[in-house]
Amino acid sequence: HPAYAARAAAQSTVTLQLPARRGNFYDAQGRLLTGLEERWQVVCFPGQGNYDRLYACTDAAGQALLYRSRSRAAPFLLEVSCDPARLGLTGYPAARRYAAVPLCQHLLGYLDSTGHGAAGLEKALDAVLSGTGENSSLVCAVTAQGTLRTGETARLLQADSGALGVQLTISRPVQRAV
């Protein structure tokens, strides 16, 4: 029966939302003020056996997520700081918004927990920087145990949020020195 087949297919498909792309701030020479640290999102599948390798490549929040999700029956996304290709994994770029030592944070401001501007230029220019807020997503055909079905790969569904960057008249080297 086609309706049962469609329902079964829907139950065995997991869609994971990648972080929405947000425009960056640039200095007067076009150098990045935000998005300086390269990061990746990696899809983790139950029983994949890469938890040990990923543990060293993520921060404390990621390590806690790995620990909580070790017996999970569905795939999940994990942010890592090392290139996933070196680990034999597929990663999706997702730069860390602010450097460990933020640049001109009094001017740029910061984001709230939903990824929208909460203060400074991040708030004032939120509509430009976030665009439509659309996310790209990964669609995974999984088994009942949450592992990727044999012969399948995660499909990336690209979405363009239309987010734009903003160039400021300040200088990154001067801001680093301050």
Regions found by a protein language model. Give the residues of each.
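Second-shell loop/turn segments in exported
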Residues: 11-16, 45, 112, 161-169
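Small/polar-residue-rich segments within soluble enzyme cores
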Residues: 34-39, 56, 61-163
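A short, polar/charged loop-to-alpha-helix boundary motif
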Residues: 41-51
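A conserved hydrophobic secondary-structure block that centers on an alpha-helix together
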Residues: 155-177
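Short, small/polar residue-rich loop motifs at catalytic or cofactor-binding pockets
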Residues: 17-21
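Aromatic-capped interface at the extracytoplasmic side
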Residues: 1-15
